[in-house]
Amino acid sequence: MIDGQPITLGGREFVAPPVPFSCMRRFADVFEGRASPTVEVMADIVFAALKRNYPDLDQKTFEDECLDVGNLNLAFMAVMQASSAREADHPGEA
């Protein structure tokens, strides 16, 4: 399991790791601060990160059973914190 931020979504415990590079590249405008993420983009980013630790996670089931209006921002912030914390702790590490 990849280290990250612990988070409870829909009554399930998850560890939200940093986003994979492919996700960062896909949503570069969000990660570089050139655009604000839409709700759909936030959900996609959260799912991409969690999929690293939970490969059997299904996106539709995850969005229907775990994400909701009350926790999407929290989940997104946990993923973003995990992504920036990893970068700050290990600068230049490949």
Predicted regions and their residues:
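A short, charged
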Residues: 38-55
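Charged interaction scaffolds used for protein-protein
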Residues: 1-13, 21-37, 54-94
